[in-house]
Curated annotation (Swiss-Prot):
It comes from the Bacteria. ATP binds at residues 14, 173-174. This is Glutamate 5-kinase. The lineage of its organism: Bacteria, Pseudomonadati, Pseudomonadota, Gammaproteobacteria, Pseudomonadales. It comes from Stutzerimonas stutzeri (strain A1501). It is found in: Cytoplasm. Its EC number is 2.7.2.11.
Length: 372
């Protein structure tokens, strides 16, 4: 299974607070530079990279002179606000040293649960990745409450992995991976090298919580791996203090714990789509479009659509039928019903002229479609 790591094209890398701070005394610039060198090397090897970075609250605590993590939400938000500026500036300057462009993205779980905002975030991230930019993502701790109390960037990283359809999620932690017993108390504990993410036996060995600076223990990392597995991504939980750990993972070394999904990314995506039983509208296709979908594994373009029915919004499930009304496919549509009415039967290069903007060149992308 390790070839799934070395051969992964799109990585989401999550780095925890403990790996970015100097024992609670602010950001460790030297450590961040080492991480950047490894990530730039991954980029040079053809890896598309998204970074999910913890550390804003920890950095803010240091700047404010707080020795322990506060419990009051408004104090946590203040620390996040103070620390986020230093955190993103540190990443930007370190990446700039290697001529690597970065982008800051602050999100909440709500941004990824609302379908329209989810699609907008996905489009932005895809564009940044296509441009060769490394997005640096953090949870917007300054404006949320429940996430600060109960959330964690492990979960956020898994949601981002689903969002960008990553092949691999790497969760870097202060432990070397998952063990069959707690290595802090049992010297006979063995590292679990590989397992299925859905293996129920893992629940018994994933006890424990995060440290003083972070908030995600091994249980949250296991939950994150299972969440990422829903879209077919593999997850490696690995020690961030292992020298050149990212480069060595890319080289195929068996480091950390590799948690595999039940099925590959493409199959997982199709299963997820098949589970959407409720449809919001119907697109009637011409014979050419039907043939392209059935034989060519193509996306559905506006030029092949003859009629639109229903009141659907962007991102909702619609049915595609042929000229005689027989169902051909169903999928997630990139434009609302009103927008689809205006562009049906027209080539994709006219979308911007007709609507004043263009989100995607296709009505339904083939990755968001299942044939019937």
């Amino acid at each position: 299974m390790r070839d799934k790591v070395s051969g992964a094209r799109r990585w989401v890398v999550k780095i925890g607070s403990a790996l970015l701070t100097a024992d609670g005394r602010g950001l460790d610039q030297a450590a961040m530079a080492v991480w950047v060198d490894q990530m730039v090397a991954l980029r040079a090897a053809g890896v598309e990279l998204v970074l999910v970075s913890s550390g804003a609250v920890a950095a803010g605590m240091s700047r404010l002179g707080w020795a322990s993590r506060p419990k009051a939400v408004h104090e946590l938000q203040a620390a996040a606000a103070v620390g986020q500026m230093g955190l993103i500036r540190a990443w930007e300057s370190s990446f700039a040293r290697c001529d690597q462009q970065t982008a800051q993205i602050l999100v909440t779980h709500d941004d990824l649960s609302d379908r329209k905002r989810y699609l907008n975030a996905r489009s932005t991230l895809r564009t940044l990745i296509d441009l060769g930019v490394v997005p640096v993502i953090n949870e917007n701790d300054t404006v949320v409450t429940d996430e600060i109390r109960f959330g964690d960037n492990d979960t956020l990283a898994a949601l981002v992995a689903n969002l960008v359809e990553a092949d691999l999620l790497v969760i870097l932690t202060d432990r070397d991976g998952m063990f069959d017993a707690d290595p802090r108390h049992n010297p006979e504990a063995n590292l679990i090298s590989e397992a299925r993410a859905d293996d129920p036996a893992l629940d018994a060995v994933a006890g424990g919580t995060g440290g003083a600076l972070g908030r995600g223990g091994m249980q949250t990392k296991l939950r994150a791996a299972r969440l990422a597995a829903r879209s077919g991504a593999h997850t490696v939980i690995v020690g961030g203090r292992i020298e050149q750990v990212l480069s060595r993972l890319k080289a195929g070394e068996r480091l950390g714990t590799l948690l595999a999904p039940e099925c590959n990314r493409h199959a997982a995506r199709k299963q997820w789509l098949a589970g959407h039983l409720q449809t919001r509208g119907t697109l009637t296709l011409d014979e050419g479009a039907v043939l392209a979908l059935r034989q060519g594994n193509r996306s559905l373009l506006p030029v092949g659509v003859r009629a639109v029915q229903g009141a659907f919004r962007r991102g909702e499930m619609v049915v595609c039928v042929g000229p005689q009304g027989a169902e051909v496919a169903r999928g997630l549509v990139n434009y609302s019903a009103a927008e689809a009415q205006r562009i049906l039967g027209r080539p994709s290069d006219e979308i911007e002229k007709l609507l004043g903007y263009v989100d995607e060149p296709e009505l339904i992308h083939r990755d968001n479609m299942i044939l019937v």
